[in-house]
Amino acid sequence: MKKGYITQVIGPVVDIRFEGDLPPINNAIKIPMGDRELVVEVAQHIGDNTVRCVAMASTDGLRRGMECIDTGGPIMVPVGKGVLGRMFNVLGQPIDELGEVKDVKYMPIHKKPPSFEEQNPATEILETGIKVIDLLTPYPKGGKIGLFGGAGVGKTVLIMELIRNVAIEHGGYSIFAGVGERSREGNELWLEMHEAGVIDKTAFVFGQMNEPPGARMRVGLAGLTIAEYFRDEEHQDVLLFIDNIFRFVQAGSEVSALLGRMPSAVGYQPTLATEMGALQERITSTKKGSITSVQAIYVPADDLTDPAPATTFAHLDATTVLSRSIAEMGIYPAVDPLDSTSRILEPHIVGEEHYYVARKVQEILQRYKELQDIIAILGMEELTEEDRLIVYRARKIQRFLSQPFFVAEAFTGTPGKYVPLKETIRGFKKIVEGEMDDIPEPAFYMVGTIDEVYEKAEKMK
């Protein structure tokens, strides 16, 4: 064990001098502080036998000359079946007051991404049971999905429904990394997962808003390491939820400024693309298993060209855009069917029928959007017979894209629905081909499959 001593402390940044060999970049160094132990991570070698480190917790109480011990490797987090149903901080210490973690191994949070030979391109759909997603923005198994949305449009509810559906319908594991999250939201999610009965299929890692930037910057990697173990050693298909990827970038920007690096565009860190790549390149499918990641992305001032969301875009396979105008209509999940995209919505991947139905749905909705100005000024009577039909079908499609969620049962009083992909395609095909033209609009709202529309229409007679 190499030992050194503190030479200077500037906020969350600590300089430590070692005689002889210096610990390499990314090594964890422990600083004993009486009843607790502070962990710092080596960020730079600044010459004169000194390393500059970033703290993972508050540096209150540190002083010059204190002894520091190099652990000889990066931060290690617990992995394995023992982490399921538990909640950890960035250092892998349990924060749920349920005692010690049992039945786990420890792995470093820094490692190389899988090589090209090991990778397996994502060309298979992960069925979510959510109609609008499966039809228009199919999620690739082992792909990366971005969830763009403002406050209060339902990002968290959508994430919770996805965790529930994957756990119950697919029997898969989910890892949730709260990066710069509100502690309240983390607590709500924890309680929701208990109520939904899927807590034993889920592991949580949190680095909340109130923690130093070092912790917020590394918590995503800690969650990813747990997911990688399930993929590589247990050969599982895992879901990794990161909320919020923007806070990861923000923490990196704070650390960069503290380390004295010159800022680049819009004041972000010059290493923005490298840091994002180091995280994103490890989230991938291999021949052993897959990691499918759903990442909530906050868009500063609704500007998608801001360096943070713009850098994230380059890595994504599918984008789900949540829209306030759709939420205002009472249609949940409030996914924008025209703004959301998916790389795998191609006929050779999803099949001709799925592709045809999805494009037809978008075509009808796009035409309806164009006609809305005319309707607002002149009314429906001025439209041609053909356009009127498109409007009626579009309104039915809009309502049929809504769906009752399991995790929202307590609020809506409507039991949740899981809709298989085949049923989703069959339902929308009937609408676009005119088979449902004589069924009233309200019958399409908040139902699961198309058969339920018939049942609802019967009751309305």
Swiss-Prot record:
SUPFAM superfamilies: C-terminal domain of alpha and beta subunits of F1 ATP synthase, N-terminal domain of alpha and beta subunits of F1 ATP synthase, P-loop containing nucleoside triphosphate hydrolases. Keywords: ATP synthesis, ATP-binding, Cell membrane, CF(1), Hydrogen ion transport, Ion transport, Membrane, Nucleotide-binding, Translocase, Transport. GO terms for molecular function: ATP binding; ATP hydrolysis activity; proton-transporting ATP synthase activity, rotational mechanism. NCBIfam families: atpD. Produces ATP from ADP in the presence of a proton gradient across the membrane. The catalytic sites are hosted primarily by the beta subunits. Belongs to the ATPase alpha/beta chains family. This is ATP synthase subunit beta. It comes from Caldanaerobacter subterraneus subsp. tengcongensis (strain DSM 15242 / JCM 11007 / NBRC 100824 / MB4). The lineage of its organism: Bacteria, Bacillati, Bacillota, Clostridia, Thermoanaerobacterales.
